[in-house]
């Protein structure tokens, strides 16, 4: 039951931050207490803000508020891999895939495992960017279509 309550707290906490209307930790504490989390205090809120990488930024009304930037979220094993891919672009020689931070090496490893049979000669991955080189005789557009199908079907 305690784990269920903690999971619920974390879900509610993230939902509150997504509203982008809380400018102080005390406002977050009050909102959580109003929602029935009586054991919440400023130090717990501070730890949760740190855990989720929350930042203070200006919302659309130019108010300083806490928020959770989605693009900074860390990939986990329950994340569908296609949701980690932000953009696929190319030139005449390479395909470049932009991913969520920290996801590039995971996705590149999967693409390397598919390998030459699907037209991938090799990949180079950083933190959030993958360079893909096609095999000789494989067109860039053809390889992009293959990669997109892989993300839709099996990843």
Swiss-Prot record:
NCBIfam families: argR_whole, PRK05066.1. It comes from Mannheimia succiniciproducens (strain KCTC 0769BP / MBEL55E). It is found in: Cytoplasm. Pathway: Amino-acid biosynthesis; L-arginine biosynthesis [regulation]. The gene is argR. One of its GO terms (cellular component) is cytoplasm. InterPro entries: Arg_repress (IPR001669), Arg_repress_C (IPR020899), Arg_repress_C_sf (IPR036251), Arg_repress_DNA-bd (IPR020900), WH-like_DNA-bd_sf (IPR036388), WH_DNA-bd_sf (IPR036390). The lineage of its organism: Bacteria, Pseudomonadati, Pseudomonadota, Gammaproteobacteria, Pasteurellales. GO terms for biological process: L-arginine biosynthetic process; protein complex oligomerization; regulation of arginine biosynthetic process. This is Arginine repressor. Keywords: Amino-acid biosynthesis, Arginine biosynthesis, Cytoplasm, DNA-binding, Repressor, Transcription, Transcription regulation. SUPFAM superfamilies: C-terminal domain of arginine repressor (SSF55252), Winged helix' DNA-binding domain (SSF46785). It holds the Pfam family Arg_repressor_C. The keyword Secreted does not apply. Belongs to the ArgR family. One of its GO terms (molecular function) is arginine binding.
């Amino acid at each position: 039951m305690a784990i269920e309550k903690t999971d619920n707290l974390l879900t509610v906490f993230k939902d509150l931050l997504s509203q982008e209307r809380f400018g102080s930790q005390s406002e977050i504490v009050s909102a959580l207490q109003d929602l029935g989390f009586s054991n919440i205090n400023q130090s717990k809120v501070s730890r949760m803000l740190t855990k989720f990488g929350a930042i203070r930024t200006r919302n659309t009304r130019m108010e300083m508020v806490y928020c959770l930037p989605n693009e900074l979220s860390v990939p986990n094993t329950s994340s569908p891999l296609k949701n980690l891919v932000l953009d696929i672009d190319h030139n005449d020689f390479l395909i470049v895939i932009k991913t969520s931070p920290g996801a590039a090496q995971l996705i590149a490893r999967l693409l390397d495992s598919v390998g030459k049979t699907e037209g991938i000669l090799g990949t180079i991955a950083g933190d959030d960017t993958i360079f893909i080189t096609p095999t000789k005789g494989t067109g860039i557009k053809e390889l992009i279509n293959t990669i997109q199908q892989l993300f839709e079907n099996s990843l």
